Structures are given as structure tokens and as C-alpha cells.
From Swiss-Prot:
Keywords, ordered alphabetically: Chloroplast, Membrane, Photosynthesis, Photosystem I, Plastid, Thylakoid
Protein's name according to its UniProt entry: Photosystem 1 reaction center subunit 8
Localisation: Plastid, Chloroplast thylakoid membrane
Organism: Cucumis sativus (Cucumber)
UniProt function note: Essential for the activity of NADP photoreduction.
UniProt KW Magnesium keyword: no
Top-level taxon of origin: Eukaryota
Main location: plastid
Gene designation: PSAM
One GO cellular component term: photosystem I
GO biological process, any: photosynthesis
Keyword Chloroplast: yes
């Protein structure tokens, strides 16, 4: 998982 992009933020937002 890359925390340098919006992808990580989306995963955290899902929680």
C-alpha cells in the first residue's frame, strides 16, 4: 500500500 497518494487516504476513509 502506498501512503504517498490518495489511494491510502481512500482506504483510511473507508474505515
Amino acid at each position: 500500500i502506498q501512503a504517498d497518494x490518495p489511494t491510502f487516504q481512500v482506504i483510511q476513509d473507508d474505515n
